[in-house]
Amino acid sequence: MKKTLIFIVFILTLNAEAFAKETTYKKELFDKAASDGKVVIVSSWIKYCTSCASQMKILKKAKNEGELSDIKFDNIEYFSFDVTNKEIADLFDVQYQTTLLIFKDNKEVYRSIGETTKDLIYEALKASI
């Protein structure tokens, strides 16, 4: 019984993370960040996707908690969008949730689908700076 309750709480926690997503991508903000010479990260998600939530959590933790002390996050802009938003998905040629894009000098320098390994995401960030 105790294991069942723990499992239910775990599943509810994952679903709570899946609901915590919002579209932050705005074309004018993306264009301004790119023209200001910032590295721009764009991630796609879909409702109920726990992998998407994990990926977003890694990116937010890196920025908000300074996990990557050798990266200056004031030169990085992070946006996310719901992959069902066809206009944005088509703009970036994104077909799947958990697509992670990194742009530098207004050019795409990194693309992955489904990557939720913290070390690999951090490695991609470091390589893009």
Task: Indicate where each model-derived feature is located.
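N-terminal leader/targeting and pre-domain segments
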Residues: 4-5, 10, 18-37, 126-129
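Structural signal for short hydrophobic segments within the conserved structured cores
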Residues: 23, 77-79, 109-112
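Short active-site neighborhood of thiol/selenol oxidoreductases, capturing the structured segment around
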Residues: 35-47
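Structural micro-motif
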Residues: 39, 92-101
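The canonical Cys-X-X-Cys-His
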Residues: 44, 49-52, 100
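Thiol-based oxidoreductase modules, predominantly thioredoxin-like and allied folds used
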Residues: 44, 69-86
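Typically the conserved alpha-helix immediately C-terminal to a functionally engaged Cys/Sec
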Residues: 53-68
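Non-catalytic, surface beta->alpha helical segment in thiol-disulfide oxidoreductase systems
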Residues: 102-129
